[in-house]
Amino acid sequence: MSPILINMLLAFTISLIGLLIYRSHMMSSLLCLEGMMLSLFILTSTLALTMHFTLMTMMPIILLVFAACEAAIGLSLLVMVSNTYGLDYVQNLNLLQC
């Protein structure tokens, strides 16, 4: 395996571990999710370039679109929860249920 692939897999793993450890605050969870999406974007981009798949060249762009949508929805949810409750704890999201 090339060092770039190892680094991207390590970055994804560190972001996943960070998501599991720092899950109490919503902002840190969103940052870890963004780190995971960025490492997946770089990983799919390098795989598409090294494998020379013509059908796989659109995959990084699609992944980037989903990452932007996820970031927008996550930030709007963070603003809504922090304006309503004054906190960004993930435990307060259970209060949003009917």
Swiss-Prot record:
Its EC number is 7.1.1.2. Keywords: Electron transport, Membrane, Mitochondrion, Mitochondrion inner membrane, NAD, Respiratory chain, Translocase, Transmembrane, Transmembrane helix, Transport, Ubiquinone. InterPro entries: NADH_UbQ_OxRdtase_chain4L/K (IPR001133), NUOK/Mnh_C1-like (IPR039428). It comes from the Eukaryota. It is a multi-pass membrane protein. It is found in: Mitochondrion inner membrane. GO terms for molecular function: NADH dehydrogenase (ubiquinone) activity. One of its GO terms (biological process) is ATP synthesis coupled electron transport. It is an enzyme of class 7 (translocase). Core subunit of respiratory chain NADH dehydrogenase (Complex I) which is composed of 45 different subunits. This is NADH-ubiquinone oxidoreductase chain 4L. It comes from Chrysochloris asiatica. The gene is MT-ND4L.
